[in-house]
Amino acid sequence: MANICDTQYKVMGERKAVADLWNTLQTMEVNTKNVYLYKLAEHYGIDYEKMGISVRGHIYWAEFEADEDICLLSFDTESAWSACEEFFDELNKVLGGELSVSYREIECGCDIFYVHDEQGFFPEECCVSSSGEPFEDACEDIFDTCQDAIAKWCEKMGISQGDRT
C-alpha cells in the first residue's frame, strides 16, 4: 500500500443503523482479521468504482458500546494516503443518513493531521512526527495543545524552551 493513513472513527446515531454496521463488521470477523473497505462497499451495494470513491484500506479494530441513551461504534482504519471519508459518507446514506461520523486522520508522511469531530471525541490540537536520535524508531504523538507538543519535544531533545514560544 502507499503511505498509510491511520484514522480513528467514532460513529453514533440511530441504534438500528449503528447496530447494522456493527453486525456486518462482526460477520466479516473484525478484530480477528482485517475488514477490507471494498468488501464492506460490496456488502452494502456501493459502486465505489463508478462513483470514483477510494476504498483502498481496511478496518483492523472495532468496538461497540450501547446503553439506553448512547449507541457508539468505534473503529480504526489503515488506508492509502488519506482517510476514506467519501466512502463513509456514502455508507451513511445507504444506512439512512442516521449516523454522526467523527474521525481523526493522521498520515505524517503527507503532512496530514485532520479532525472532523461532530461529538467532541478528538480534542487534540496537533500531531508531531519524528525519527532518528533521540527518538529511536519513528514516532507519532498526538497532543492536546501545541504547547504540550513543544514541551515534550524540548524534553526529548534535552533543551530548555526558555522564553521562546
Feature annotation, model-predicted:
Residues 1-165:
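Intrinsic low-complexity, intrinsically disordered or marginally ordered coil/linker segments
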